[in-house]
Amino acid sequence: MKLRLGMSPISWSNDDLPQLGGDTSLETCLSETREAGFVGTETGGKFPKDPDALATVLATHDLALVSGWYSGTLINNDLDSELAQIADQLALFKQVGASVIVYGETFNTVQNRQERPLSSRPKLADFDVAAYGRRLTALAEHCADEGVPLTFHHHMGTAVETEAELDAVMKATGEAVGLLLDTGHLVFAGGDNAAVIAKHGSRINHFHTKDIRADVLAGIDRDAESFLDCVLKGVFTVPGDGMIDYDDIMKLSLIHISEPTRPFH
């Protein structure tokens, strides 16, 4: 299995927490990404939205467009409205040659609300999962037809946070809905990366690799602290610096993930 290594600009600048790198320039982010040996990047708030401008800034640094976050609301939205909502970003990604588009379910999310504790997030069980799965599959099929596969990002603070919720979404959706396995978010939510790879390896078309500091995780009060509070406390760290076994993840990925060429970062 061939893996391409990309980077996320959130390592330099957090769009939800301007105090974390808000004054770091896009030039610094991209030049250091390439200097570190990565061949691609995701988008972020500082990236151009014009396709020609985006292509130019990427080419200047010899970087490909890996992907970028899309704030979806299909769990409480109709398909036609969602198709209209995603259209500009999908067209941008298509023109610049993104490998995938990252779908995060953000209806009533608390991921970017520092005044809301983690426990106040929406719960998947409160929605019609079967209907959600049908809409999500249709959206993913549309993205695939446009040449930009969709990858679903389970995320802390959203309606799809836990391993059980992720399992339910995978069961309710068709093959067009790829899975972005975020190793750090899954462990933060109490999940098992090895189990998810074994169950859903054929659906994984993108990775986010980060690590978790066990001591910080153990001290989190989910009824009092927000996701952004946890970020500021340092719950996340770089792969190899925390509690996640990446040797095991890589070995299992070689067994269970069939797609030969996908970005991994």
Predicted regions, residues:
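Active-site mouth loops of central-metabolism enzymes
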Residues: 11-24, 74-82, 121-128
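Short, flexible, mixed-charge acidic loops at enzyme active sites
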Residues: 20-24, 108-118, 217-229
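Acidic/histidine-rich catalytic cores of soluble enzymes
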Residues: 41, 133-243
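Short, acidic/polar
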Residues: 18-32, 82-92, 189-197, 246
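Active-site beta-loop-alpha junctions enriched in small/polar residues
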Residues: 10-12, 44-46, 70-74, 106-108, ...
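Single conserved hydrophobic/aromatic residue that forms the stacking wall/gate
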Residues: 255-265
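Active-site acidic/histidine proton-transfer and metal-coordination neighborhood
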Residues: 79-178
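Acidic (Asp/Glu)-rich catalytic clusters
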Residues: 2, 31-35, 49-67, 88-98, ...
